[in-house]
Amino acid sequence: MKLLANIFLSGLAILACVSCSKDEDPVLPLEGAKLSVAVKASGTATKAYNPNDVNELEGEAYINNLAVVVFNETGTELLGYKWEALSGAEHSAIIADVPTTKAVRARIIVLANVPRDLLSTVSTYDEFQTRLVDLSSQSQTNLTMSSQVIVTKSALSEEDNYLGYTDLGDQNVDGISDPILLTRVAARIDLVNISTRFAGTPFAGREVRIDAVGIYNMKTKSYYFSEADWGETEAPDAVRNSEDTSFEDLLVNDGTSISNTPFVHYVMENMKSDDHTMIAVKATLRGNSSYQDHTKIFTAVINAGGLQNGYDHNFIRRNYVYRLRIYFDGESFDNIPVTPDPGPGPDPEPEVDTNLNIAVQVVGWGPVMQHPVID
């Protein structure tokens, strides 16, 4: 079983009945089956918010809406789809009566937290593969998720069909009784700790002010889904820097570290680009009677050595949390003597230092387990 988090979609039942569609549903001739999806969304064992030791933040498992799209086996024909709002993250819900026009071998994709009109613009599987989700639509309580592509080996029956219902065992389509997994398309970056190591250096007794934190080279777009379970969704290009998050009086010294996770940011998958996603920290070594303030912007690629450190990937992969710990030492700044008569000109722009001392922990997001609900 995978240790890292997925959201477990409890079951998929295909019913061979004909009934009236709701106004918002597509009106299709019902010669084949109808698709019903039963979901139970439950949280982690505890919902206490403690960003230092809980990987999943409150709301990150919410399933606000659920969408199902069904193509024929080759993906050349759209057989049916439906989008439906759900009542909340920790409530059972059913998306019922997704119409399909034919009882044939099918290609099925399940998504959560997607725009209502997404599927209405799609007519083939290849076309749907090109659709992109934007980072701006992602938030702590509305993270897009998707299943792998489910291609049935047998045709959908005109009788009832089930997929992912544990209690039904071999009665499921192709005998697939394990719950269907929904995986987030975003990743999360947490700056969990900032410290100094100035003892025995020229900066002993000094403190550092954290002025701002941002993300450089973050991917802002992703594909909605992958054919494989937890597969790649990285989109080309779409790389930019985030807006900085500014701080006031955020101070750190050898006696007082910052360990309350002052910075959290979502990004999209970025494993193949030459522009690797980086953390950027603007920090100032506080001056004293002898030395001036010295401000620099420190950067480091996130998870550049993931494989070397025992993780299963380098850089940024969807549905992971990257917990960053940084520190400043005797090599981080310069001692700049106080100038008796400083000139009237503006302060120089901070230099960029690519040698930020950083440790990266790659952790699972969740887990959140959904149990079957069969009505």
Swiss-Prot record:
It holds the Pfam family P_gingi_FimA. Residues 17-47 form a propeptide. Residues 1-16 form the signal peptide. InterPro entries: Fim1C-like_C, FimA_N. Keywords: Cell outer membrane, Fimbrium, Lipoprotein, Membrane, Palmitate, Signal. A lipid is attached at residue 17 (S-diacylglycerol cysteine). The keyword Lipoprotein applies. It is found in: Fimbrium; Cell outer membrane. A lipid is attached at residue 17 (N-palmitoyl cysteine). GO terms for cellular component: cell outer membrane; pilus. Its main location: other. The keyword Membrane applies. May be part of the fimbrial tip. Probably a component of the fimbrium tip. Fimbriae are filamentous appendages on the cell surface that mediate cell adhesion and biofilm formation. Belongs to the bacteroidetes fimbrillin superfamily. FimA/Mfa1 family. This is Putative fimbrium tip subunit Fim1C.
